[in-house]
Every structure is written in structure tokens, then in C-alpha cells.
Amino acid sequence: MDLVNHLPDRLLFAVPKKGRLYEKCCNLLSGADIQFRRSNRLDIALSTNLPIALIFLPAADIPVFVGEGNCDLGITGLDQIKEAEQFDNIEDLLDLKFGSCKLQIQVPADGEYEKPEQLVGKKIVSSFTKLSTDYFKQLSDKPTNIRYVGGSVEASCALGVADAIVDLVESGETMKAAGLKAIETILETSAHLISSKKSKFPEMVNIIVQRLQGVLAAQEYVLCNYNAPKSIQAKCLTITPGRRAATVSTLDKHSDDEEDWVAISSMVNRKEIGNVMDELKKAGATDILVLEISNCRV
């Protein structure tokens, strides 16, 4: 079935059908209010509130489908985009800040190899043969034997298939359990939102980008509200400058107030909020509140 012609009024959005990115993609789409129900046996789901069809594909195939214009949008790893050589055919719209891992060269922990240069001309196993080949070509003109394996790459050294592997690593625990250690990082990767340069739905693409940016901002920031004497306003604003700027309002002056007061509201990186609250209190701010941001547009 040619979905491009079968669903002419819907933007085709490719997302990973399983694996490390699938669940987080679904959570991201839910946060962006892209509503859908997926049958267990189908790799197509129609959005119930937007003119979008979600196409569930292997992450490695998504850059090709988007790059060739078969899908308008896609979510996949930066590693897969580079491996598929599709950067000339797609727009890299957003780093989605999840699925972070490293494409590393791993060797037996008790072996002789300590530097990548020692592996030139040896047997390397990887699911990323293009990236691996490019890396070793930069090291030497001498050819390196790079073989493709689709899964369980970490077992290759123990089985005698390879002298080293090139594979994605998150925590590194799987590699340690397989008796491997990292000697080089080829690429740091995460999930990215990409679009086809041939998309017929630029307005819907922009809407989705704005929604996803809002979800990411809501995950990254909290809203910090507090009151402060006007005399320390400038100092407080250096502590909470806001994402673009803080919102400052004048408070009604009570009869027993010796000076004017202001209410300040500012977006603060959630990783820094504890220190920010301590600094505000030390500066003389009061009534310091932190509120979650469920969603926003930035």
C-alpha cells in the first residue's frame, strides 16, 4: 500500500516501533496532545485529534523513509541518521534530549588493545558499519575488516568473531558483563526530530515542532514565584533571570511596610531550583514557591 497516496490529507509521522526509544516517544507524543490508539498488530495509527498518521518503523529505517519523502516527520537517533547518510535530504529540527548514549569502540577488558590505532587491520563487528568504516579510514589507509551484525554485538569478541566491537552504550553495564571496556567514543547520540525536505504539510510540521518544544521546556523548567523588597529586585533578578526575562509586578503597599515590594515570577531550570531557592532566601526574598509546568509554548 502506498501510504503517501492512500492518506493524502494526513501528515505521515514515523516513530520507532520498539526498542529503547519507543516508550519515550509515546510519552512525548502524549505530552504534545497527539492522540492515537495503536492496535497490537498494526504499525499504523491514525491520530484522533490531528490530521496525522503515525507509522511505526524500525529506528534504522526512519531516516531513509523521511529522507526519500515517504514520511513527513520522524523520530530516531542521531546515530541512525548519520549511519543512513541522509543529512542532505532531511531537516534536523530538534534534539529531543532523550535516548542519550554513546557509540563506542569496545575491546576485551583483559586483552592487549588500549588504543583504536591498534585495531587498524583487525576484525571489527558492528551494527554501524558506515560510521565504523569512516572512523577507521580516518585513522589509516590500511583497510580494517568491519562486519555487520544486527544484534547481540557484545557477544562477538567472546565468540571469537571479532577483535573489537562498535556499539551503542548507555550505562555500560551490559558491556562490563560481557567482559568489555571502552577505548574510544565515536559519537554521542540522542533522539532527534527530523523532517523531509519534500513535506507537503509545512504548517502542521511547525505546529508539531512548537508542541514538542513546549513539552521539552516543561520538562526542563519549573516556575519560581516569590516576593521581595524592591530594593533587592535587581539582585534577585540576577538569581532568576528567567528563560527570556522574569515577570515583575508591584505589590500593594501595606501600612506597616517600610518600602515597596514586588512579586517576581521566573522560569528556572529544575536541576538548579534547590540552589536558586537558597540564594533567594539568603538575598531577602520571601514566600518562595515552585510550581510545575505541565505544558507551555516557548
Swiss-Prot record:
Segments forming a coiled coil: none
Pathway named in the protein's UniProt entry: Amino-acid biosynthesis; L-histidine biosynthesis; L-histidine from 5-phospho-alpha-D-ribose 1-diphosphate: step 1/9
SUPFAM superfamilies named in the record: GlnB-like, Periplasmic binding protein-like II
Top-rank EC class of the record's enzyme: transferase
Entry EC no(s): 2.4.2.17
Key words of the record: Amino-acid biosynthesis, ATP-binding, Cytoplasm, Glycosyltransferase, Histidine biosynthesis, Nucleotide-binding, Transferase
Major subcellular location class: cytoplasm
Catalysed reaction, written as an equation: 1-(5-phospho-beta-D-ribosyl)-ATP + diphosphate = 5-phospho-alpha-D-ribose 1-diphosphate + ATP
InterPro entries xref list: ATP-PRT_HisG_long, ATP_PRibTrfase_cat, ATP_PRibTrfase_CS, ATP_PRibTrfase_HisG, HisG_C, N-reg_PII-like_a/b, N-reg_PII/ATP_PRibTrfase_C
GO BP: L-histidine biosynthetic process
GO cellular component: cytoplasm
Pfam family of the protein (one): HisG
Function (record text): Catalyzes the condensation of ATP and 5-phosphoribose 1-diphosphate to form N'-(5'-phosphoribosyl)-ATP (PR-ATP). Has a crucial role in the pathway because the rate of histidine biosynthesis seems to be controlled primarily by regulation of the enzymatic activity.
PANTHER family hit by this protein: ATP PHOSPHORIBOSYLTRANSFERASE (PTHR21403:SF8), ATP PHOSPHORIBOSYLTRANSFERASE ATP-PRTASE (PTHR21403)
Protein's name according to its UniProt entry: ATP phosphoribosyltransferase
Source organism of the structure: Candida albicans (strain SC5314 / ATCC MYA-2876)
